[in-house]
């Protein structure tokens, strides 16, 4: 196995200090971007969306659970309509991300609710959630325009084809796998003020990188990420890898 250059402790320290300066530049740049994100304008959500959870139907406002902020992760689902005729389960890449979600107490203490949303029947969601052992609340948006309006599911009969702020022409040229009938991963954030709900932010594709906890740890190592994000299987199937 090839390893990085072997040097003296003094040389290593000098190289590490050089990298530290670059890391601090990135940290300061990220601080500025995070501040700009908090200052984004918002749009009011006036459309009624209905979701189905373990306790029955709930509105978008109901997903907040009485808190002021709501983060929804658009969890892709594998089924016949999305091009997987022999499957009825969550996307393995979205599962890789969900495996990084820990206890939600700290989010709740900051007046923030995190939920997963999928365009799948609630019975299928509950079966898969039990298999994976996740405690994060998970809702079905089946029959709702929610996924389409926030550009995480694609049906030109419901909404113009758009993903990651790219129009249909750009998508057909750059990412032809984004097409009607499919889903895309994403996260959408909402703020509640009394009875009003506002959409504040949505991110897709590489914009979700910071949510991948496994990558955060691997990025600290000399071998790095090693696998593309789509190369991670369901965590309970590693013993089936060749």
Regions found by a protein language model. Name each.
Residues 1-110, 127-133, 137, 144-242:
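Non-globular targeting/processing and membrane-anchoring segments
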Residues 109-125:
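Catalytic nucleophile loop
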Residues 118, 140-142:
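Residues at the C-termini of beta-strands that transition into short coil/loop
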